[in-house]
Amino acid sequence: MNHFPYTNSDIEPGDFVINPSNRNWGIGQIQSLIGNKVTVNFENKGKLVINTEKIILEKVKN
């Protein structure tokens, strides 16, 4: 899998991401995106709301 930084216009619900600062959270699937708030359901951490002004997620591509 390849990982790369994104802009909010590059992601949408259903996309898969990782938090490079907390890789142990595993891969997360975006549930919703409103402004700079992204709700992500991570496989090892559960559902979290991420502020994309503070944390840059990396989109996962197969």
Predicted segment positions?
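Intrinsically disordered, low-complexity, charged/polar segments
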Residues: 1-3, 47-62
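Glycine-centered tight beta-turn/hairpin loop motif at sheet-sheet or coil-to-beta transitions
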Residues: 23, 43-45
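SH3/SH3-like beta-barrel fold
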Residues: 38-42
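Short beta-strand-centered aromatic/proline hotspots
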Residues: 26-33
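Mixed-charge, Lys/Arg-rich low-complexity intrinsically disordered regions
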Residues: 1-16, 24
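Intrinsically disordered, charged low-complexity linkers and terminal tails
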Residues: 16, 37, 58-62
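Residue-level signal for tight coil/turn positions that link beta-strands
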Residues: 34-35, 52
